[in-house]
């Protein structure tokens, strides 16, 4: 048998074990529980923590973005380093939105301020512009012991929360933002999970239901599984550039109320993995729907700087909410999220982010503050970087021209790569790619022949997982199967980032297109 095929099957077997199943398909909790009891009877071992005794919700958690495809990609990289011959010379990881890992250069101003915050002796270095030094000094002044190595307040450094509030006010045309409603966090993911923890309760038919878009970012399904909440799917309209349809929301909510208590509506705008940008009208409709149905709104807006398509504009849910008047602005409960990891910054490793809460019950807000206090505080270097992002150089300051040139170059390149991705993928008869209006991903639909579907099913794989694993083994291109994000039954997709350098992206897209044609011919 082909060694690469053996390796990929080993990875798939490993993933079954990782998700609580033996190679024969027997639940490991059942098998290992018997083994543990038998060993206990023999007096040799008595494990307290087994798959049978552990939290069952954890075994339900899945996160496709770092699933079996990525495990195999890492193995292939090691094999290439060891001189193993492959039909490709490198593995291209187009599976995750990590801009710097894909070669994007850091924004100079952000790194200069961060460098001085980390090593204040650099304040004496003449290579650093004065506005950089002033920004770093202001941040350090707000830190305990004037060091970002100190803990901060659990909600985040007050000066930085004030700067975040001012940023939101500028973004939203002067609508007031209260720093006391701002919670800094370890990336946006941390605050999203924190908010879900507050919202989820109940048992049986009273269990909290959370409406999430399908396709979705797997953080949501993973968090809901861990919290034992009910995932309530509403499907985006692929035929209409992945638009959100209020009628579909209503259908989903009506069905969910038969078996759970839906309380939360999650929106991702711009979309991940689907790359759509919602219109203002759509956002207004969603807010009205949430008000009518008494739903808590969660607006994931981490890609708010990533809008490329002509005619598309980012509208924050908060801005639209307040412009709709007191009927909505004084009643609809909203939490919105932003991050240092996306946008033009791409500073994933700093783990910076924030959440703003609107119309939250003061007593619940006290509980939220208590909950975040348990984890002491978000990483202070991430807080410092967030401050520089929301409080960038102003016209006339020494760093302004370079900062704007670098920012515009990054966003301009992303816009061009979004256009290229759609154009090249749509040249293949079996691939259909909607316009990448925003964010960092395309989510093309692929035709998979019936023969390949049956082979995949025989191996216990989703058909698009089968396709993506073959793609990786034969081309070195690592993308994520659409089944990991959710999709309508009978359709197949994959998610890929548009982050690789332009030349590498062109090559990747051409190779992907050629592979799909070859794959289709082989299995037809």
UniProtKB/Swiss-Prot annotation:
N6-(pyridoxal phosphate)lysine modifications at: 342
Co-factor requirement: pyridoxal 5'-phosphate
Keyword Ribonucleoprotein appears in the UniProt entry: no
Pfam families, per database record: Aminotran_1_2
SUPFAM superfamilies assigned: PLP-dependent transferases
GO biological process, one term: L-alanine metabolic process
GO MF, one example: pyridoxal phosphate binding
Pathway participation: Amino-acid degradation; L-alanine degradation via transaminase pathway; pyruvate from L-alanine: step 1/1
Catalytic reaction(s) noted: L-alanine + 2-oxoglutarate = pyruvate + L-glutamate
Keyword Hydrolase: no
EC numbers: 2.6.1.2
CDD domains membership: AAT_like
Family per record: Belongs to the class-I pyridoxal-phosphate-dependent aminotransferase family. Alanine aminotransferase subfamily.
Entry function: Catalyzes the reversible transamination between alanine and 2-oxoglutarate to form pyruvate and glutamate.
Subunit structure: Homodimer.
Protein name: Alanine aminotransferase 2
Organism of this sequence: Xenopus tropicalis (Western clawed frog)
Gene (UniProt): gpt2
């Amino acid at each position: 048998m082909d060694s690469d095929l053996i390796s990929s099957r080993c990875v798939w077997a490993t993933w079954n074990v990782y998700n609580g199943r033996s190679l024969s398909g027997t639940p490991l909790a059942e098998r290992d529980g018997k083994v543990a009891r038998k060993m206990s009877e023999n007096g040799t071992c008595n494990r307290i923590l087994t798959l049978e005794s552990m939290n069952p919700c954890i075994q339900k958690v899945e996160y496709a973005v770092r699933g079996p495809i990525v495990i195999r990609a890492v193995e292939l990289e090691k094999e290439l380093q060891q001189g193993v011959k492959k039909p490709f010379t490198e593995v291209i990881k187009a599976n995750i939105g990590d801009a710097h890992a894909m070669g994007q250069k850091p924004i100079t101003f952000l790194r200069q301020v961060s460098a001085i915050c980390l090593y204040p002796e650099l304040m004496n270095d003449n290579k650093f512009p004065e506005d950089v030094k002033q920004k770093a000094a202001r941040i350090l002044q707000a830190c305990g012991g004037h060091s970002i190595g100190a803990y901060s307040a659990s909600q985040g450094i007050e000066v930085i929360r004030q700067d975040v509030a001012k940023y939101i006010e500028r973004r939203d045309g002067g609508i007031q933002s209260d720093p006391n409603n701002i919670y800094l966090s370890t990336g946006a993911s941390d605050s999203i999970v924190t908010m879900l923890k507050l919202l989820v309760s109940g048992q049986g038919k009273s269990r909290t239901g959370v409406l999430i878009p399908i396709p979705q970012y797997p953080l949501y399904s993973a968090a809901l599984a861990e919290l034992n909440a009910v995932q309530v799917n509403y499907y985006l309209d692929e035929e209409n550039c992945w638009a959100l349809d209020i009628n579909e929301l209503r259908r989903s909510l009506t069905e969910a109320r038969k078996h759970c208590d839906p309380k939360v509506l999650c929106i991702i705008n711009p979309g991940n993995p689907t790359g759509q940008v919602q219109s203002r009208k759509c956002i207004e409709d969603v807010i009205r729907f949430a008000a009518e149905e008494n739903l808590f709104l969660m607006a994931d807006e981490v890609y708010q700087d990533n809008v490329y398509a002509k005619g598309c504009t980012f509208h924050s849910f908060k801005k639209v909410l307040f412009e709709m008047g007191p009927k909505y602005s004084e009643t609809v409960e909203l939490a919105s999220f932003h991050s240092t990891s996306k946008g033009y910054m791409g500073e994933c490793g700093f783990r910076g982010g924030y959440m703003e809460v609107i119309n939250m019950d003061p007593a619940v807000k006290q509980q939220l503050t208590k909950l975040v206090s348990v984890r002491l505080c978000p990483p202070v270097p991430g807080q410092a970087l967030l401050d520089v992002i929301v409080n960038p150089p102003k016209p006339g300051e020494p760093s302004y021209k370079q900062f704007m040139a670098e920012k515009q170059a990054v966003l301009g390149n992303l816009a061009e790569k979004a256009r290229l991705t759609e154009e090249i993928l749509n040249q293949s008869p079996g691939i259909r790619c909607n316009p990448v209006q925003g964010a960092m991903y395309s989510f093309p639909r692929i035709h998979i022949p019936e023969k390949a579907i049956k082979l995949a099913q025989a191996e216990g794989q989703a058909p698009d997982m089968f396709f993506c694993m073959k793609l990786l083994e034969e081309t070195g291109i690592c993308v994520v199967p659409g089944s990991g994000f959710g999709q309508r039954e009978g359709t197949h997709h994959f998610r890929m980032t548009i982050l690789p350098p332009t030349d590498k992206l062109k090559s990747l897209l051409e190779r992907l297109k050629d592979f799909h044609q070859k794959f289709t011919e082989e299995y037809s």
